[in-house]
Amino acid sequence: MLQNIRIVLVETSHTGNMGSVARAMKTMGLTNLWLVNPLVKPDSQAIALAAGASDVIGNAQIVDTLDEALAGCSLVVGTSARSRTLPWPMLDPRECGLKSVAEAANTPVALVFGRERVGLTNDELQKCHYHVAIAANPEYSSLNLAMAVQVIAYEVRMAWLATQENGDAADHEEMPYPLVDDLERFYGHLEQTLLSTGFIRENHPGQVMNKLRRLFTRARPESQELNILRGILASIEQQNKGK
Protein backbone atom coordinates (compact mmCIF):
# COMPACT_ATOMS: atom_id res chain seq x y z
CA MET A 1 0.00 0.00 0.00
CA LEU A 2 2.72 2.50 0.94
CA GLN A 3 4.43 1.90 -2.40
CA ASN A 4 1.33 3.43 -4.00
CA ILE A 5 2.06 6.77 -2.31
CA ARG A 6 4.29 9.04 -4.38
CA ILE A 7 6.26 11.89 -2.87
CA VAL A 8 6.55 14.41 -5.71
CA LEU A 9 9.10 17.24 -5.55
CA VAL A 10 8.72 20.05 -8.08
CA GLU A 11 11.83 21.82 -9.41
CA THR A 12 14.02 21.12 -6.41
CA SER A 13 17.12 23.32 -6.51
CA HIS A 14 19.40 21.70 -3.89
CA THR A 15 20.59 18.11 -4.07
CA GLY A 16 20.99 18.04 -0.30
CA ASN A 17 17.24 18.51 0.02
CA MET A 18 16.65 15.49 -2.20
CA GLY A 19 18.78 13.39 0.14
CA SER A 20 17.13 14.73 3.28
CA VAL A 21 13.69 14.07 1.78
CA ALA A 22 14.71 10.50 0.91
CA ARG A 23 15.78 9.96 4.52
CA ALA A 24 12.51 11.44 5.83
CA MET A 25 10.55 9.16 3.51
CA LYS A 26 12.35 5.93 4.29
CA THR A 27 12.07 6.37 8.06
CA MET A 28 8.29 6.31 7.55
CA GLY A 29 8.28 3.42 5.08
CA LEU A 30 7.84 5.48 1.91
CA THR A 31 10.14 4.82 -1.04
CA ASN A 32 8.36 6.16 -4.13
CA LEU A 33 10.08 9.46 -4.97
CA TRP A 34 9.35 11.53 -8.08
CA LEU A 35 11.41 14.55 -9.16
CA VAL A 36 9.71 16.98 -11.53
CA ASN A 37 12.13 19.01 -13.66
CA PRO A 38 14.78 19.20 -10.92
CA LEU A 39 17.11 22.16 -11.35
CA VAL A 40 19.99 19.89 -10.33
CA LYS A 41 20.42 16.13 -10.61
CA PRO A 42 20.99 13.92 -7.56
CA ASP A 43 24.71 13.75 -6.70
CA SER A 44 27.09 12.67 -3.94
CA GLN A 45 25.66 15.28 -1.56
CA ALA A 46 22.19 13.84 -2.04
CA ILE A 47 23.52 10.36 -1.29
CA ALA A 48 25.38 11.61 1.79
CA LEU A 49 22.36 13.37 3.28
CA ALA A 50 20.12 10.40 2.46
CA ALA A 51 22.05 8.61 5.25
CA GLY A 52 21.17 5.05 4.33
CA ALA A 53 18.24 5.92 2.06
CA SER A 54 20.35 6.13 -1.10
CA ASP A 55 18.12 3.47 -2.67
CA VAL A 56 15.23 5.95 -2.59
CA ILE A 57 17.41 8.44 -4.50
CA GLY A 58 18.66 5.79 -6.91
CA ASN A 59 15.14 4.61 -7.75
CA ALA A 60 13.62 8.10 -8.02
CA GLN A 61 11.59 8.80 -11.15
CA ILE A 62 12.77 11.97 -12.92
CA VAL A 63 10.20 13.55 -15.25
CA ASP A 64 9.85 16.82 -17.11
CA THR A 65 6.33 17.83 -16.09
CA LEU A 66 3.99 17.57 -13.13
CA ASP A 67 1.39 15.90 -15.34
CA GLU A 68 3.80 13.00 -15.89
CA ALA A 69 4.29 12.59 -12.15
CA LEU A 70 0.53 12.59 -11.53
CA ALA A 71 -0.37 10.18 -14.34
CA GLY A 72 -2.28 7.17 -13.05
CA CYS A 73 -3.11 8.74 -9.67
CA SER A 74 -6.66 9.02 -8.35
CA LEU A 75 -5.83 11.42 -5.51
CA VAL A 76 -3.44 14.39 -5.53
CA VAL A 77 -2.69 16.54 -2.49
CA GLY A 78 -0.51 19.65 -2.80
CA THR A 79 1.25 21.43 0.03
CA SER A 80 0.44 25.11 0.42
CA ALA A 81 1.54 27.51 3.14
CA ARG A 82 -0.19 30.57 1.70
CA SER A 83 -3.80 31.68 1.54
CA ARG A 84 -4.90 31.67 -2.10
CA THR A 85 -7.16 34.07 -3.96
CA LEU A 86 -9.27 31.10 -5.02
CA PRO A 87 -9.95 28.99 -1.88
CA TRP A 88 -9.51 25.23 -2.32
CA PRO A 89 -10.59 22.21 -0.25
CA MET A 90 -8.10 21.97 2.63
CA LEU A 91 -6.76 19.13 4.77
CA ASP A 92 -4.59 19.14 7.84
CA PRO A 93 -1.69 16.62 7.86
CA ARG A 94 -3.67 14.02 9.82
CA GLU A 95 -6.58 14.15 7.40
CA CYS A 96 -4.10 13.99 4.55
CA GLY A 97 -2.58 10.82 5.98
CA LEU A 98 -5.95 9.15 6.43
CA LYS A 99 -7.21 10.00 2.94
CA SER A 100 -3.94 9.02 1.30
CA VAL A 101 -3.78 5.61 2.94
CA ALA A 102 -7.45 4.85 2.26
CA GLU A 103 -7.07 5.57 -1.44
CA ALA A 104 -3.61 4.03 -1.83
CA ALA A 105 -5.12 0.63 -1.07
CA ASN A 106 -6.35 0.61 -4.67
CA THR A 107 -4.68 3.30 -6.78
CA PRO A 108 -1.59 5.54 -6.69
CA VAL A 109 -1.70 8.75 -4.65
CA ALA A 110 0.56 11.78 -5.14
CA LEU A 111 1.67 14.12 -2.35
CA VAL A 112 3.17 17.15 -4.07
CA PHE A 113 5.76 19.51 -2.58
CA GLY A 114 6.84 22.72 -4.27
CA ARG A 115 10.03 24.68 -4.77
CA GLU A 116 12.14 25.53 -1.75
CA ARG A 117 11.56 29.28 -1.99
CA VAL A 118 8.17 29.77 -3.64
CA GLY A 119 6.30 26.48 -3.31
CA LEU A 120 3.77 25.43 -5.93
CA THR A 121 2.26 27.78 -8.50
CA ASN A 122 -1.48 28.40 -8.64
CA ASP A 123 -1.71 26.34 -11.84
CA GLU A 124 0.04 23.43 -10.13
CA LEU A 125 -2.17 23.66 -7.06
CA GLN A 126 -5.26 23.58 -9.27
CA LYS A 127 -4.23 20.10 -10.40
CA CYS A 128 -4.69 18.89 -6.81
CA HIS A 129 -7.87 17.54 -5.24
CA TYR A 130 -6.89 19.00 -1.88
CA HIS A 131 -4.31 21.32 -0.37
CA VAL A 132 -2.60 20.48 2.90
CA ALA A 133 -1.17 23.05 5.30
CA ILE A 134 1.01 22.38 8.33
CA ALA A 135 -0.08 24.39 11.37
CA ALA A 136 3.35 25.68 12.34
CA ASN A 137 4.13 28.50 14.76
CA PRO A 138 2.73 31.63 13.04
CA GLU A 139 5.58 33.68 14.47
CA TYR A 140 8.13 31.38 12.83
CA SER A 141 6.53 29.01 10.34
CA SER A 142 9.58 28.34 8.16
CA LEU A 143 9.81 24.59 7.57
CA ASN A 144 12.37 23.39 5.07
CA LEU A 145 11.40 20.88 2.39
CA ALA A 146 12.52 17.77 4.27
CA MET A 147 10.74 18.91 7.44
CA ALA A 148 7.48 19.31 5.55
CA VAL A 149 7.86 15.88 3.97
CA GLN A 150 8.65 14.37 7.39
CA VAL A 151 5.47 15.79 8.96
CA ILE A 152 3.23 14.49 6.17
CA ALA A 153 5.05 11.15 5.92
CA TYR A 154 4.63 10.61 9.68
CA GLU A 155 0.87 11.10 9.43
CA VAL A 156 0.76 8.71 6.47
CA ARG A 157 2.58 6.09 8.53
CA MET A 158 0.30 6.55 11.53
CA ALA A 159 -2.75 6.11 9.31
CA TRP A 160 -1.22 3.02 7.71
CA LEU A 161 -0.33 1.47 11.08
CA ALA A 162 -3.93 1.98 12.19
CA THR A 163 -5.18 -0.01 9.21
CA GLN A 164 -2.76 -2.83 10.06
CA GLU A 165 -3.89 -2.95 13.68
CA ASN A 166 -7.57 -2.84 12.75
CA GLY A 167 -7.26 -5.31 9.89
CA ASP A 168 -8.72 -2.77 7.48
CA ALA A 169 -6.10 -3.36 4.81
CA ALA A 170 -7.27 -6.85 3.91
CA ASP A 171 -10.47 -6.04 2.11
CA HIS A 172 -11.09 -2.80 0.26
CA GLU A 173 -13.76 -2.03 -2.29
CA GLU A 174 -12.40 -0.63 -5.51
CA MET A 175 -12.38 3.17 -5.40
CA PRO A 176 -14.79 4.59 -7.99
CA TYR A 177 -12.92 7.85 -8.52
CA PRO A 178 -11.40 8.71 -11.91
CA LEU A 179 -7.67 9.04 -12.40
CA VAL A 180 -6.07 12.45 -12.77
CA ASP A 181 -5.55 11.75 -16.47
CA ASP A 182 -9.30 11.28 -16.96
CA LEU A 183 -10.08 14.48 -15.06
CA GLU A 184 -7.66 16.49 -17.19
CA ARG A 185 -9.28 15.14 -20.36
CA PHE A 186 -12.67 16.13 -18.94
CA TYR A 187 -11.47 19.66 -18.16
CA GLY A 188 -10.08 19.96 -21.68
CA HIS A 189 -13.38 18.71 -23.12
CA LEU A 190 -15.37 21.10 -20.91
CA GLU A 191 -13.25 24.10 -21.89
CA GLN A 192 -13.53 23.28 -25.59
CA THR A 193 -17.31 22.96 -25.31
CA LEU A 194 -17.62 26.27 -23.45
CA LEU A 195 -15.49 27.94 -26.12
CA SER A 196 -17.54 26.46 -28.96
CA THR A 197 -20.81 27.66 -27.40
CA GLY A 198 -19.41 31.14 -26.77
CA PHE A 199 -19.82 30.84 -23.00
CA ILE A 200 -16.16 31.77 -22.60
CA ARG A 201 -13.85 33.55 -25.02
CA GLU A 202 -10.45 32.18 -25.89
CA ASN A 203 -8.62 35.45 -25.30
CA HIS A 204 -10.63 36.41 -22.20
CA PRO A 205 -11.57 33.22 -20.31
CA GLY A 206 -11.59 34.98 -16.93
CA GLN A 207 -11.79 32.74 -13.87
CA VAL A 208 -14.51 30.46 -15.21
CA MET A 209 -12.36 27.36 -15.74
CA ASN A 210 -10.51 27.84 -12.46
CA LYS A 211 -13.79 28.07 -10.58
CA LEU A 212 -15.22 25.07 -12.41
CA ARG A 213 -12.12 23.08 -11.49
CA ARG A 214 -12.70 24.01 -7.87
CA LEU A 215 -16.37 23.04 -8.15
CA PHE A 216 -15.63 19.57 -9.53
CA THR A 217 -12.73 19.11 -7.12
CA ARG A 218 -15.08 19.82 -4.23
CA ALA A 219 -17.79 17.54 -5.62
CA ARG A 220 -15.25 14.86 -6.62
CA PRO A 221 -17.42 12.97 -9.13
CA GLU A 222 -17.10 9.21 -9.38
CA SER A 223 -15.97 7.59 -12.62
CA GLN A 224 -19.52 6.85 -13.80
CA GLU A 225 -20.60 10.40 -12.99
CA LEU A 226 -17.67 11.78 -14.95
CA ASN A 227 -18.67 9.62 -17.91
CA ILE A 228 -22.19 11.09 -17.73
CA LEU A 229 -20.74 14.61 -17.78
CA ARG A 230 -18.57 13.72 -20.78
CA GLY A 231 -21.66 12.35 -22.50
CA ILE A 232 -23.53 15.62 -21.86
CA LEU A 233 -20.65 17.60 -23.37
CA ALA A 234 -20.56 15.31 -26.39
CA SER A 235 -24.31 15.78 -26.87
CA ILE A 236 -23.93 19.58 -26.74
CA GLU A 237 -21.14 19.40 -29.31
CA GLN A 238 -23.29 17.23 -31.58
CA GLN A 239 -26.18 19.68 -31.35
CA ASN A 240 -23.88 22.58 -32.20
CA LYS A 241 -22.60 20.77 -35.29
CA GLY A 242 -26.16 20.31 -36.49
CA LYS A 243 -26.93 24.04 -36.41
Swiss-Prot record:
GO biological process: tRNA nucleoside ribose methylation
Key word Methyltransferase present: yes
Enzyme Commission number(s) from the entry: 2.1.1.200
InterPro entries: Alpha/beta_knot_MTases, RNA_MeTrfase_TrmJ/LasT, SpoU_MeTrfase, tRNA_m1G_MTases_N
Record's subcellular location: Cytoplasm
Primary localization: cytoplasm
A Pfam family of this chain: SpoU_methylase
GO molecular function per UniProt: RNA binding; tRNA (cytidine(32)/uridine(32)-2'-O)-methyltransferase activity
Catalytic activity from the UniProt record: cytidine(32) in tRNA + S-adenosyl-L-methionine = 2'-O-methylcytidine(32) in tRNA + S-adenosyl-L-homocysteine + H(+); uridine(32) in tRNA + S-adenosyl-L-methionine = 2'-O-methyluridine(32) in tRNA + S-adenosyl-L-homocysteine + H(+)
EC class name: transferase
An example Gene Ontology CC term for this record: cytosol
The entry's keywords: Cytoplasm, Methyltransferase, S-adenosyl-L-methionine, Transferase, tRNA processing
Family (UniProt): Belongs to the class IV-like SAM-binding methyltransferase superfamily. RNA methyltransferase TrmH family.
Function summary: Catalyzes the formation of 2'O-methylated cytidine (Cm32) or 2'O-methylated uridine (Um32) at position 32 in tRNA.
Entries under PANTHER family matching the protein: TRNA (CYTIDINE_URIDINE-2'-O-)-METHYLTRANSFERASE TRMJ (PTHR42786:SF2), TRNA/RRNA METHYLTRANSFERASE (PTHR42786)
Assembly behavior: Homodimer.
Protein name per the record: tRNA (cytidine/uridine-2'-O-)-methyltransferase TrmJ
